[in-house]
Amino acid sequence: MQVLVDADACPAVIKDMLFRAARRAEICVTLVANQFLRTPPSPFIKSVQVPAGFDVADARIVELAQAGDLVITADIPLAAAVLDKGAHALDPRGNWFSRENIEERLSTRAMMDQLRSSGVDTGGPAPFSARDGKAFASQLDRFLARHGKP
Protein backbone atom coordinates (compact mmCIF):
# COMPACT_ATOMS: atom_id res chain seq x y z
CA MET A 1 0.00 0.00 0.00
CA GLN A 2 1.26 3.44 -0.90
CA VAL A 3 -0.11 6.95 -0.54
CA LEU A 4 -0.22 9.07 -3.70
CA VAL A 5 -0.76 12.81 -3.34
CA ASP A 6 -2.16 15.20 -5.93
CA ALA A 7 0.33 17.71 -4.59
CA ASP A 8 -0.10 20.85 -6.71
CA ALA A 9 -3.12 22.05 -4.73
CA CYS A 10 -2.61 20.08 -1.52
CA PRO A 11 -2.31 22.35 1.55
CA ALA A 12 1.16 22.41 3.14
CA VAL A 13 -0.26 21.33 6.50
CA ILE A 14 -1.64 18.16 4.89
CA LYS A 15 1.70 17.40 3.23
CA ASP A 16 3.40 17.80 6.62
CA MET A 17 0.93 15.35 8.19
CA LEU A 18 1.63 12.88 5.40
CA PHE A 19 5.40 13.23 5.86
CA ARG A 20 5.05 12.44 9.57
CA ALA A 21 2.72 9.52 8.84
CA ALA A 22 5.15 8.09 6.26
CA ARG A 23 7.96 7.99 8.79
CA ARG A 24 5.78 6.75 11.65
CA ALA A 25 3.99 3.99 9.69
CA GLU A 26 6.90 3.30 7.31
CA ILE A 27 4.70 3.64 4.23
CA CYS A 28 5.62 5.13 0.88
CA VAL A 29 4.18 8.60 0.24
CA THR A 30 4.60 9.90 -3.31
CA LEU A 31 3.80 13.50 -4.16
CA VAL A 32 2.94 14.10 -7.82
CA ALA A 33 3.08 17.69 -9.12
CA ASN A 34 3.94 19.72 -12.19
CA GLN A 35 6.52 21.70 -10.22
CA PHE A 36 9.50 20.82 -8.06
CA LEU A 37 8.50 20.03 -4.48
CA ARG A 38 10.91 20.04 -1.58
CA THR A 39 10.44 16.98 0.60
CA PRO A 40 12.15 15.94 3.82
CA PRO A 41 14.86 13.31 3.52
CA SER A 42 13.27 9.91 4.07
CA PRO A 43 13.31 6.56 2.31
CA PHE A 44 9.49 6.64 2.58
CA ILE A 45 8.89 10.01 0.86
CA LYS A 46 9.40 10.80 -2.80
CA SER A 47 8.34 13.41 -5.29
CA VAL A 48 7.45 12.91 -8.96
CA GLN A 49 7.55 15.99 -11.17
CA VAL A 50 5.50 15.79 -14.37
CA PRO A 51 5.44 18.26 -17.28
CA ALA A 52 3.03 21.17 -16.96
CA GLY A 53 -0.24 20.58 -18.73
CA PHE A 54 -3.90 19.88 -18.25
CA ASP A 55 -4.43 16.75 -16.12
CA VAL A 56 -0.83 15.50 -16.61
CA ALA A 57 -0.34 14.98 -12.87
CA ASP A 58 -3.75 13.32 -12.61
CA ALA A 59 -2.88 10.89 -15.42
CA ARG A 60 0.39 9.98 -13.69
CA ILE A 61 -1.43 9.34 -10.40
CA VAL A 62 -3.94 7.07 -12.16
CA GLU A 63 -1.03 5.26 -13.81
CA LEU A 64 0.73 4.73 -10.46
CA ALA A 65 -2.36 3.84 -8.41
CA GLN A 66 -3.07 0.23 -7.57
CA ALA A 67 -5.87 -1.50 -5.71
CA GLY A 68 -5.62 -0.75 -1.99
CA ASP A 69 -3.56 2.44 -2.37
CA LEU A 70 -4.67 5.72 -0.83
CA VAL A 71 -4.91 8.79 -3.07
CA ILE A 72 -5.14 12.26 -1.54
CA THR A 73 -6.94 14.65 -3.88
CA ALA A 74 -9.72 17.23 -4.06
CA ASP A 75 -10.10 16.50 -7.79
CA ILE A 76 -13.39 14.63 -8.26
CA PRO A 77 -12.67 13.12 -11.72
CA LEU A 78 -9.28 11.92 -10.45
CA ALA A 79 -10.97 10.36 -7.42
CA ALA A 80 -13.42 8.57 -9.74
CA ALA A 81 -10.56 7.21 -11.85
CA VAL A 82 -8.60 5.82 -8.90
CA LEU A 83 -11.75 4.34 -7.35
CA ASP A 84 -12.22 2.48 -10.65
CA LYS A 85 -8.77 0.95 -10.07
CA GLY A 86 -9.70 -0.19 -6.55
CA ALA A 87 -7.78 2.54 -4.72
CA HIS A 88 -9.17 4.65 -1.88
CA ALA A 89 -9.61 8.41 -2.28
CA LEU A 90 -9.60 11.01 0.51
CA ASP A 91 -9.77 14.77 0.09
CA PRO A 92 -7.60 17.15 2.14
CA ARG A 93 -10.62 18.09 4.27
CA GLY A 94 -11.06 14.52 5.48
CA ASN A 95 -13.96 13.53 3.23
CA TRP A 96 -13.93 10.13 1.55
CA PHE A 97 -14.83 9.60 -2.07
CA SER A 98 -16.60 6.27 -2.53
CA ARG A 99 -18.46 4.22 -5.11
CA GLU A 100 -21.62 5.33 -3.26
CA ASN A 101 -21.01 9.09 -3.52
CA ILE A 102 -18.80 9.63 -6.56
CA GLU A 103 -21.59 9.88 -9.17
CA GLU A 104 -23.38 12.53 -7.12
CA ARG A 105 -20.13 14.45 -6.65
CA LEU A 106 -19.40 14.29 -10.40
CA SER A 107 -22.95 15.49 -11.21
CA THR A 108 -22.69 18.39 -8.77
CA ARG A 109 -19.31 19.35 -10.25
CA ALA A 110 -20.76 19.27 -13.79
CA MET A 111 -23.72 21.41 -12.73
CA MET A 112 -21.41 23.97 -11.07
CA ASP A 113 -19.21 24.06 -14.20
CA GLN A 114 -22.30 24.70 -16.31
CA LEU A 115 -23.45 27.52 -14.02
CA ARG A 116 -20.00 29.13 -14.10
CA SER A 117 -19.82 28.89 -17.89
CA SER A 118 -23.18 30.68 -18.11
CA GLY A 119 -21.84 33.56 -16.01
CA VAL A 120 -23.16 32.64 -12.57
CA ASP A 121 -20.73 33.35 -9.73
CA THR A 122 -20.83 30.14 -7.72
CA GLY A 123 -18.12 31.19 -5.29
CA GLY A 124 -15.47 28.73 -4.26
CA PRO A 125 -14.73 26.40 -1.43
CA ALA A 126 -14.41 27.77 2.08
CA PRO A 127 -10.84 28.51 3.19
CA PHE A 128 -8.99 25.50 4.59
CA SER A 129 -9.42 25.49 8.36
CA ALA A 130 -7.85 23.87 11.41
CA ARG A 131 -11.03 21.80 11.68
CA ASP A 132 -10.42 20.49 8.14
CA GLY A 133 -6.88 19.52 9.12
CA LYS A 134 -8.11 17.66 12.20
CA ALA A 135 -10.74 15.81 10.15
CA PHE A 136 -8.08 14.78 7.64
CA ALA A 137 -5.66 13.63 10.36
CA SER A 138 -8.39 11.55 11.98
CA GLN A 139 -9.38 9.83 8.73
CA LEU A 140 -5.74 9.24 7.76
CA ASP A 141 -4.95 7.68 11.15
CA ARG A 142 -8.00 5.39 10.92
CA PHE A 143 -7.06 4.33 7.41
CA LEU A 144 -3.44 3.60 8.32
CA ALA A 145 -4.53 1.62 11.39
CA ARG A 146 -6.65 -0.60 9.12
CA HIS A 147 -4.52 -0.72 5.96
CA GLY A 148 -0.96 0.24 6.91
CA LYS A 149 1.99 -2.09 7.26
CA PRO A 150 1.16 -5.24 9.23
Swiss-Prot record:
Lineage top rank: taxon: Bacteria
Family: Belongs to the UPF0178 family.
Organism field: Burkholderia ambifaria (strain MC40-6)
Protein name: UPF0178 protein BamMC406_1579
Pfam families (UniProt xref): DUF188 (PF02639)
